[in-house]
Amino acid sequence: MLELKGRGAIVAGTRRIGSAVVKRLAREGVNLAIVYRSSRDAADALHASVRDGIERACVIQADLSSAQDVKRLVDMAERQLGELSFCVNLASDYPRTPYQLLTAADWDRAMAAAKGAYLLALESSRAMQRNAGPTRGHIVFFGDWAAEETPYRDFLPYLTAKAAVHFMTRAFALELAPHGILVNAISPGPTARDPALVSSAEWKAALAQAPLHRESSEEEMAELVATLLKLETVTGENIRVDSGRHIGGTMLDDEEPGA
């Protein structure tokens, strides 16, 4: 298993689950590049909370849908951290739009997130190839439990983009295996309800469909990330952390999505 201490990691999308991931990796002694798109204050606060416990940490602004921005981000992270072993990409919007209101702009917005996942994996993997050892790096995408065969309503472009991320996980894993780089995905189910998107009633309905009837915690996701990064023979996997909701299926009739 890999020793994480002293290795460099990019973590993109550092609010909610991403914040927990940054804090968990900091406890392992991982040097961190905290990447944000527009929430500078939140990124700075997160940086301040971890910088004293690790050797190196930095905050970098980037638009992941821009190839130029992503290349600049990876180059800067590698310089600031000394080397780059890990990339954890949680950057994604969660736009809820009823089918009747969908437009081309909704599709473009969702596909921009998938493009960002592709670009960041591409550039970070090229940096990882400069590392020594049989395991040179590890990329972790974040998907969605429902982006396989069980979609829920009102999130069509978002779930389509996440399905692309799931396929990218396997494709990148195959391409990068000869270079000693592992690629996996984590797909959360109901985790830390956002009241602006999901009502209490909808949340209860979502949990009722999960066999365990429990929501996952941000800390549980972060623990899984830390564990995955230590492993050296797991690649191409999509791990669903959803209390078994994918077994229960999607919501039908007049029920509303809650994840």
State where each predicted segment sits.
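Canonical Rossmann dinucleotide-binding motif of NAD(H)/NADP(H)-dependent dehydrogenases/reductases
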Residues: 2-33
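C-terminal substrate-recognition "lid" of short-chain dehydrogenase/reductases
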Residues: 217-241, 246
